[in-house]
Each structure stands twice: as structure tokens, then as C-alpha cells.
Regions:
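Glycine-rich phosphate-binding loop and adjacent beta-alpha segment
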Residues: 147-222, 255-257
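A structural motif shared across PLP-dependent enzymes of the aminotransferase-like
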Residues: 17-31, 205
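Short amphipathic alpha-helix with an adjacent loop that forms part of the alpha/beta core around
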Residues: 124-134
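Short helix-loop-beta connector
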Residues: 39-41, 64-70, 135
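Mid-domain Rossmann-like dinucleotide-binding core that forms the NAD(H)/NADP(H) cofactor-binding site
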Residues: 48-123
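Glycine-rich beta-strand-centered segment in the early N-terminal region that forms part
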Residues: 1-20
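C-terminal capping/lid region of NAD(P)-dependent oxidoreductase domains
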Residues: 221-228, 236-260
């Protein structure tokens, strides 16, 4: 059936929040009509989606970078960290990424333009930070917390800023709370700040941020990688990758194992069903003539 919502016409490409399910009833006011024509429509769930918005806000509005500053990001090969490093580079920072494999480190330096990538599983992190940032870290975009944050806090520059985006170390503790930093005094001695920020804080500003990110993406200066798993039944397999470090870039699940189209998440295209003025109903119906299949985002929003 066609949508009777006046805000949407048949064939619109839209993005919004839904459920990991064949059918979902969602508020249509939360859906945005997207510009079509990108070479990779998965970008709307990564570089141009919440990951991109989070990276931009954390770097530019919380971190407030200055040219020449040392910018460090953890989980640097993840969906948000990889974008944060690129945005910091555009702001003139010297960018150092933390990742857990040679493959990830090579991608950060060779493809994304990071100045340095540290394999924290192979190198002593404290020694590496002192080697690559002898004058200290000015901005630390933290996606992890835990022991990594402790080590970084011992290597801060004066007036350092720590945008706190995620707590991956906490998520892996199965409900147990991690202890706080044991060198909390460094915040005082270095006049440093830790600022937590979360996507609901800037959702209303998303379209403005997305317009800026879109220009960078189209000119080729903002890149991403999608790690796509096939089949809704494998959503937990994909979800697990985020916490075990098996993914590189954005973790996505393509609902249709038979689809030949590009995957774009929680997206309605021709062939899906929409009805009512206050809600959109999504279903796993694939129109083989459509250029896009239904996709869902597998993982935390940032």
C-alpha cells in the first residue's frame, strides 16, 4: 500500500529509528527524507548518520580543536572513531588513532590519513603515547574509558579536553561497573576537562551537521567502511562484533539475503508498505526492481 502521510511520496528514501523485526510501527515524525544519488547509500547510516553527527559534535563543539594540536581517538577503526579522526584532521590537528590490529592501523593511516596509528595490543600504550605525543595530548576523543582512559590521563597536555562518547570497556563487563580513573588528580594538575555528550542532545541539529558532512563526503574527504552481515537472523552475530573488535567501520545488517541492491538501514523504498498519517509500518518485502533493500543498523548509535 502507499503512504497516506502527506510528508512522504512513493519512492522516497527515508531514515529513522525502528526495531529489529519484520514489522514495526513507528512515529513518522521521526523519519527524514534523504537526498538520493550517493554512490554508497550506506553512508546515511555512518558518515552522514548518527555516527557522523556524534563525531562532528565531539570534535568540533566539545573538543574545540586548534591547528597543530595532538588529537587522540580510541576505537579509531570503529564507525564513530574513524570519522572523528578525519574531522580532526580537517581541523588541522595531528591525529593519532588507537586500534587493535595491524589491518585496522594500516587502514587508518593509508586510507583515512591519520598521522599515527597505535596497535594497543602490540605496543605498550603509555610508552607509545610518550613517543608520539611527548608534549602531551590536547584532545582525547574517548569511546572506551577503562584502562585506556587511565593511561591517556597520565599523558595529557595542559588544558586538555576529553569528549566522552562511549564506554566500550564498561559494556563488556556484563553489568559490573568499572572503577573510576585512578589518576583523577591529572584533571586538576593539567586543568583538563571531561565532557560527556550523547546523541539525543543534538538530534535537532542533525540536518545542519549532515549538510556539512555531506559536502565533505561528496568531495571525497570523509570516508567510511561498512561491515555488512546478511540476514536478520544474524543480527546478534553482527552486534557482537562491535564489542569484540571484529568489525572495521560501521556494522550493518542487510535484511534480505537475496537482495542485489545496496543496503541502507531502516530505510523505506518502493516496495515497502507505509500507512497512516502518524506512523510508518515497515515490513520485509523486497521489490527486486528497487535499487535499495531494507537495512537495519546493528549496534549502539555511537
Amino acid at each position: 500500500s502507499k503512504s497516506s502521510n502527506p510528508n512522504f511520496k512513493e519512492g522516497d528514501l527515508v531514515r529513522g529509528f525502528g526495531e529489529w523485526a519484520d514489522y514495526a510501527n513507528v512515529d513518522s515524525d521521526s523519519f527524514l527524507v534523504l537526498e538520493e544519488g550517493l554512490d554508497h547509500e550506506e553512508a546515511y547510516l555512518s558518515a552522514l548518520g548518527l555516527n557522523g553527527w556524534t563525531a562532528y559534535v565531539g570534535v568540533m563543539e566539545v573538543g574545540k580543536p586548534k591547528p597543530g594540536e595532538n588529537f587522540l581517538v580510541s576505537a579509531a577503526a570503529g564507525a564513530t572513531g574513524s570519522l572523528a579522526g578525519q574531522i580532526a584532521k580537517k581541523a588541522g590537528c595531528r591525529v593519532i588513532g588507537l586500534a587493535g590490529s595491524k589491518e585496522k592501523c594500516d587502514w587508518l593511516v593509508d586510507d583515512l590519513g591519520f598521522d599515527v596509528a597505535i596497535n594497543y595490543k602490540e605496543e605498550n600504550l603509555d610508552s607509545a603515547l610518550k613517543k608520539y605525543c611527548p608534549e602531551g595530548i590536547d584532545i582525547y576523543f574517548d569511546n572506551v574509558a577503562g584502562d585506556v582512559l587511565n593511561t591517556v590521563m597520565a599523558n595529557l597536555a595542559l588544558n586538555a579536553r576529553i569528549p566522552l562518547s562511549g564506554l566500550l570497556a564498561q559494556y563488556n563487563e556484563k553489568g559490573a561497573r568499572l572503577p573510576g580513573p585512578d589518576n583523577f588528580d591529572q584533571l586538576l594538575m593539567k586543568r583538563a576537562t571531561i565532557t560527556g555528550f550523547f546523541c539525543p542532545d543534538f538530534l535537532e541539529d542533525g540536518p545542519r551537521i549532515e549538510a556539512l558532512l555531506s559536502e565533505w563526503y561528496k568531495e571525497g574527504s570523509l570516508k567510511f567502511k561498512a561491515d555488512v552481515t546478511i540476514g536478520l537472523e544474524n543480527v546478534l552475530v553482527a552486534y557482537k562484533k562491535i564489542f569484540t573488535g571484529e568489525n572495521i567501520g560501521k556494522t550493518l545488517v542487510n535484511w534480505n539475503s537475496t537482495s542485489s541492491g545496496v543496503a541502507v538501514g531502516l530505510i523505506l523504498k518502493s516496495g515497502t508498505s507505509a500507512g497512516g498519517n502518524t506512523s510508518i509500518t515497515t515490513c520485509r518485502i523486497y521489490d527486486p526492481s528497487a535499487t535499495v533493500s531494507n537495512l537495519i543498523e546493528a549496534g549502539v548509535s555511537n
